[in-house]
């Protein structure tokens, strides 16, 4: 989503959250 670059910076934990739509 639009936050892809942001979650990539934060790390793998946020990748999981992103996959859940967070």
Curated annotation (Swiss-Prot):
MF terms (GO), sorted A to Z: cysteine-type peptidase activity
Coiled coil: none
Keyword Cell wall biogenesis/degradation: no
Annotated segments matching region Disordered: 1-22
Keyword annotations of the record: Hydrolase, Protease, Thiol protease
Signal sequence segment: none
Highest rank taxon of the organism: Eukaryota
Enzyme Commission code(s) on record: 3.4.22.-
GO biological process terms, semicolon-separated: proteolysis
Family: Belongs to the peptidase C1 family.
Name listed for the protein in its UniProt record: Cysteine proteinase
Organism: Trichomonas vaginalis
